[in-house]
């Protein structure tokens, strides 16, 4: 679809692998190139973080790019830890995330992924959000990718993200849902260009 690869700004090898896999599937594969750019990260919602990061990355790289921010919101805690999940996980681990909900019957949570796309320097990033509902469970499966071992999506047939084969996870994940919207947008833009 694209004449040159789309730049994904991340230093996270697991995210890069998933994004490449998801965007290369289907009838209009999108080739991804990685750039790890050290950018300051503001505190805010996933939308605010992704948009700011994308704007800065496009300026630094001088080209079109995508950035991502994720969140895990516990419904009993009114959406916390949300975009700060990375810090909660680093400080508390999987067991600590479960302990946060020990006093609540409601263990439901939403996994949220927000991608921002910028056509290049000086353009306002466009936001694509994906959301997958599920619940927080004691860790199951390999604990190698963030909080995957404690998140059991409703559509996961009783498996955590970590227990799922990647091809199954990548059909229902929050990341897949956001990237599917991004793919549709990029295809529509490519069609406009061809018809001009």
From Swiss-Prot:
Entry similarity comment: Belongs to the HAM1 NTPase family.
Compartments (UniProt record): Cytoplasm; Nucleus
Protein name: Inosine triphosphate pyrophosphatase
GO molecular function terms listed in the Swiss-Prot or TrEMBL record: dITP diphosphatase activity; ITP diphosphatase activity; metal ion binding; nucleotide binding; XTP diphosphatase activity
This protein's GO CC annotations: cytoplasm; nucleus
SUPFAM superfamilies according to UniProt: ITPase-like (SSF52972)
One GO term of the biological process aspect: nucleotide metabolic process
Cofactor(s) for this UniProt protein: Mg(2+); Mn(2+)
Entry EC number(s): 3.6.1.66
Pfam families in UniProt: Ham1p_like
Catalyzed chemical reaction(s): ITP + H2O = IMP + diphosphate + H(+); dITP + H2O = dIMP + diphosphate + H(+); XTP + H2O = XMP + diphosphate + H(+)
Record text on cofactor binding: Binds 1 divalent metal cation per subunit; can use either Mg(2+) or Mn(2+).
Gene3D superfamilies noted in UniProt: 3.90.950.10
Primary localisation category: cytoplasm
Source superkingdom: Eukaryota
Residues noted as binding Mg(2+) in the record, renumbered to the chain: 41
Annotated residues for binding of ITP: 10-15, 53, 69-70, 86, 145-148, 169, 174-175
Record's function text: Pyrophosphatase that hydrolyzes non-canonical purine nucleotides such as inosine triphosphate (ITP), deoxyinosine triphosphate (dITP) or xanthosine 5'-triphosphate (XTP) to their respective monophosphate derivatives. The enzyme does not distinguish between the deoxy- and ribose forms. Probably excludes non-canonical purines from RNA and DNA precursor pools, thus preventing their incorporation into RNA and DNA and avoiding chromosomal lesions.
PANTHER family: INOSINE TRIPHOSPHATE PYROPHOSPHATASE, INOSINE TRIPHOSPHATE PYROPHOSPHATASE/HAM1 PROTEIN
Subunit details: Homodimer.
